[in-house]
Amino acid sequence: MPRCARAVSLTGYYHVFDRGNSKQIIFEDDSDRYRFLSDISDRFARHKVAVLAWCLMDNHFHLMVDDPYDNLSKAMQCALTAYAKYFNGKTGRTGHLFDNRYSRVAVESDTQAVQLLDYIHLNPVKGAIDSLEAYRWSSFRAYQLGYDPFDICDAAPMLDIVGGSRRYCEHLKEVAGRIW
């Protein structure tokens, strides 16, 4: 049976996420995380897809992307295949690394975009990390500093929406306080 067509976002923004097959760990160490970010950065640049936010957890990842040319499917296929080949070769395993086809949810408004940004950056806190500042495997620092130390994330479009780094950090602390 064919799969349903994916929803197309009018804004070009999407929430993209996937997890390990059977919830297995897909990032064993920092070298795996660096490799995944490199694969995403390289393949997305080739396909003109911009990463606006990201977060890597041990068994899953979240991305917020801008896909103005409808190239996300090809970019994800290339990036996830490259990473799966690397990880399977490194660990001596075979078969599917990821649970299923990645998930993609259309983001249709600035309000939804900010909510997604919050969700992505607060994901490590839900995973028992003490503070956002202490967790290095997300784009939070790009929003806190105004530039991405990993050079993968373009924070500028969302910082324009939220009123800059300082306002976003204050907003995120307020949101975190309401949730926890």
Q: What function would you assign to each model-found segment?
A:
Residues M1-A53, M57, D66-W180:
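Short Pro-Cys-Gly-centered "Cys-loop" motif that presents a nucleophilic cysteine in a tight turn
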